[in-house]
Amino acid sequence: MMKTILPICLALTAIGTAAAQSAKQAPAYAPSAKPSYNAPFTDPANVARDLARIDASMNATFSFQGDFVQVAPNGAVSKGKIWLQRPGKVRFEYDAPNPLLIVSDGVTMVQNDRDLETFDRVPLSATPLNYFLKENINLANDTEVIGLRKMPGQWIVTARDGSGQQEGAITLVFNSETLALQTWIIADDFGGATRVQLSNLAYNGQIDPGKFILREDSNRRRRRN
């Protein structure tokens, strides 16, 4: 099967799901087959338990909105607003002069270049984002976790698509105390990496459903006016 290679502007949305501000103790976790965890795992004996805690924290977050800063592989910096609602919905609205708007309605992810008036689509299920916008997030089952480093103030998880259909890897950086998602990094197979840092997040509030609808005709009319 042909591998899915996503544009970097779509790949940056791979892991949009935020953790709750305060994490609750996860229930006992007993995987059916115990995997073998080696370096770069700093606490290999407790990886299953730690992943279960991260899952529980992310599953406790059904929505958030706030700010993001993106650093592209070439060092270019973009800022903007993010809205996320599980399952399946996310919106990245870039500040000018970046013309991009990226929206998932739960089925399809659309990238709109507001200068060129172009719309590029990819099924949400074909992106790594699908794993982390699910109604029930389970990192151990849904991805191949290839690293979990517990550092002072941070837990750093690296995962990739276990099926081999998607290129690259994703690194998630969590606050070690609250397990709130702070940063994610998308690494591609060409040595490039895109970093997205989240800030000023408000969790589990109501979000206007229209944020996750992208209509081509209305956007074009708005641009011409």
Locations of regions flagged by a protein language model:
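Gly/Pro-enriched, hydrophobic low-complexity segments
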Residues: 140-141, 150-225
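Extracytoplasmic
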Residues: 59-63, 77-79, 85-87, 96-97, ...
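An acidic-aromatic
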Residues: 24-30, 81-130, 194-195, 200
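Compositionally biased, proline/threonine/alanine/serine-rich low-complexity intrinsically disordered stretches
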Residues: 17-53, 216-225
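Flexible, surface-exposed loop/linker segments and immediately adjacent secondary-structure boundaries
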Residues: 116-155, 160-163
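Sec-dependent N-terminal signal peptides
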Residues: 1-21
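Short hydrophobic/aromatic-rich beta-strand segments that constitute the beta-sheet cores
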Residues: 66, 90-94, 109-112, 157, ...
